[in-house]
């Protein structure tokens, strides 16, 4: 494959299309209700509020098993999701901040350990982002700091 004399060569798309046809994903399902416990071991739940992600996990009791990994990307209510995970036997293994369209979001990997974690209230606001301080993590923490400072001023 290459470009010769300003002409593109043909690309064989048959194999990628055949592979895509074999992927069977449940559609129009409520949360994980259409997923069987043995269907996958890694789940991505993204693009919704942290409170909804917590409700999705709570509604599927079979996810409380150490063999599953969860990649979670809450758009809002991140604090609520972190609190749910800490209080329901999940551990946040790693967490990163990513910037998209001027907003900074978190993406976390969580696993079930069965042990509830006593988390410092500050953990609900910044999670594990302080462990890997790159530009997006610093921006996320700075934004959270402003929110906390404003809340403190409003209380005065």
Question: What are these language model-derived features?
Answer:
Residues 40-47:
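Short SAM/SAH-binding signature in class I
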């Amino acid at each position: 494959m290459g470009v010769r004399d300003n002409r593109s060569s043909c690309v064989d798309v048959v194999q990628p299309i055949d592979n895509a046809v074999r992927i069977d994903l449940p559609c129009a399902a409520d949360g994980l209700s259409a997923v069987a416990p043995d269907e996958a071991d890694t789940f991505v739940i993204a693009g919704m509020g942290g409170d909804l992600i917590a409700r999705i996990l709570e509604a599927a009791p079979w996810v409380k098993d150490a063999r599953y990994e969860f990649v979670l990307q809450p758009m809002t209510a991140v604090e609520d999701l972190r609190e749910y995970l800490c209080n329901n036997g999940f551990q946040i293994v790693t967490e990163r901040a990513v910037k998209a369209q001027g907003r900074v979001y978190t993406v976390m990997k969580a696993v079930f350990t069965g042990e509830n974690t006593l988390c410092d209230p500050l953990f609900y606001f910044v999670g594990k982002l302080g462990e890997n301080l790159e530009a997006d993590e610093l921006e996320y923490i700075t934004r959270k700091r402003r929110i906390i400072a404003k809340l403190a001023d409003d209380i005065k």
